[in-house]
């Protein structure tokens, strides 16, 4: 009888992935530019987040060709094994990977591998061993900490610079397609500030801001459809009444003035619930 390994090698697409078969306690890394994380092990289900190229995740469960993973920020989701490969041990603590990884992090770049194949990487992806940057920008951790300090004006500038023109995509975390909480988490992570992935999680981070008039740049504004309902939207304050956000009602990236009188803005203001200050000195 053929071994599990020999049976797996019968499918050329699964050769590299066959190593995952007994790897429930192992870690994986994304080999695609973006690996969609879904709510169920089914390609037809909803994307809840994304594992970016070079990022590491812990495997919690396996169902057929699907892996239930937990990303470095603790977010769970199902990813098809075609998007990932097993990471050799030892694996560094997940808190030291992802956006805190010392490897060059893409600011939007193109890389070439040892087979001379090129690939575009979005903001937040990691350039891995054997890849050479041939276009765009990528920075190792030490340079990122200097270029992207944990300061309010720098964080808001990054949100506006990198995500301008981005289309709305549920579960997205990059300028290739992003949702409201993805804009927040990616913008803050770039500056070394850890915030949760979802808006309702972000709503319990930091310190409360008593009123909208007290909001400062890089504070977060939270919105819900019902006064006591679950938080469903988040925006980043630019100071005063201006915000930057990824909004379904705007089709994606938008800078809005909450003092405006258009119908969308008036409805948004009605949904405002509270603010939070993530930075100690915003």
Stretch-by-stretch model annotation:
Residues 25-38, 93-109, 186-202, 238:
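Short, basic/aromatic beta-hairpin or loop at an interaction surface
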């Amino acid at each position: 009888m053929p071994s599990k390994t020999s049976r797996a090698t019968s499918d050329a697409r699964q050769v590299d992935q066959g190593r995952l078969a007994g790897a429930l306690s192992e870690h994986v890394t994304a080999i695609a530019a973006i690996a969609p994380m879904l709510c169920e092990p089914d390609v037809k289900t909803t994307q809840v987040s994304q594992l970016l190229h070079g990022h590491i995740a812990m495997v919690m469960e396996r169902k057929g060709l699907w892996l239930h993973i937990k990303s470095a920020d603790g977010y769970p989701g199902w990813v098809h094994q075609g998007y990932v490969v097993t990471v050799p041990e030892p694996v560094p603590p997940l808190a030291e990977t992802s956006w805190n990884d010392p490897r060059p992090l893409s600011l939007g770049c193109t890389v070439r591998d040892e087979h001379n194949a090129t690939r575009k990487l979005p903001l937040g992806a990691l350039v891995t061993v054997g890849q050479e940057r041939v276009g765009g920008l990528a920075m190792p951790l030490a340079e990122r900490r200097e270029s992207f300090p944990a300061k309010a004006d720098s964080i808001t500038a990054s949100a506006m610079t990198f995500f301008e023109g981005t289309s709305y995509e549920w579960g997205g975390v990059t300028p290739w397609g992003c949702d409201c909480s993805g804009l927040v988490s990616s913008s803050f992570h770039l500056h070394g500030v850890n915030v949760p992935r979802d808006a309702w999680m972000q709503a319990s981070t930091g310190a409360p801001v008593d009123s909208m008039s007290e909001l400062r740049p890089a504070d977060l504004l939270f919105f819900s459809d019902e006064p006591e309902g679950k938080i469903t939207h988040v925006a980043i304050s630019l100071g005063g009444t201006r915000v930057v956000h990824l909004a379904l009602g705007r089709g994606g990236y938008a800078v809005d003035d909450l003092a405006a009188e258009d119908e969308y803005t008036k409805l948004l203001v009605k949904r405002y619930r509270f603010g939070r200050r993530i930075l100690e000195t915003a």
